[in-house]
Curated annotation (Swiss-Prot):
Homodimer. The lineage of its organism: Eukaryota, Viridiplantae, Streptophyta, Embryophyta, Tracheophyta. The record marks 56-57 as: Reactive bond. It comes from the Eukaryota. Disulfide bonds join 39-84, 136-147. This is Trypsin/chymotrypsin inhibitor. PANTHER family: KUNITZ TRYPSIN INHIBITOR 2 (PTHR33107), TRYPSIN INHIBITOR A (PTHR33107:SF81). GO terms for molecular function: serine-type endopeptidase inhibitor activity.
Amino acid sequence: TNPVLDVDGNELQRGQLYYATSVMRPGGGLTLAAPKGSCPLNVAQAPFDEYSGRPLAFFPENADDDTVQEGSTLYIMFPEPTRCPQSTVWTFDREAGFVTTGGTTSKAIGPHNSRFAIRKAGDASSQPRDYQIEVCPCSTGVERPSCRMGCLGTLGLAEGGKNVLLNINNESPHTIRFVKVKEG
């Protein structure tokens, strides 16, 4: 497998902070949005190009991996605290059809909706460091997979009230680039 790279060509590292910025314009990086002011918060695209979004951290499910690998399952979270009691770990809410927070980093056997994988964008116009995120309830890239089931699909953008949310959209996947958050 290949490591996932940021825009500078460096490998994404476990627990480091990155912005996930949109390749498509208009639209900023990934951030959080409150559905009708309630909790848990949804993962959304920032409305303005200038806004890089909130910093994200990635945690490969394979504990031996300090580098994020293409196609291997991982947990994604916004490390900054929010006003909601739920965790800021991403999860795919199958009922609503959107990515929200309140996920788990459990390595439990069986499928759960907090596992994601990053894959290279496959469109003809894609650049080498363009990626897409898939919802993968069963582990991949680990010694003992938690279950056997393919990924559910690739995340795309969908209107969700006033916000642009992430849903499964294989027809029109959302392509992003990772920008390391500069210290200080």
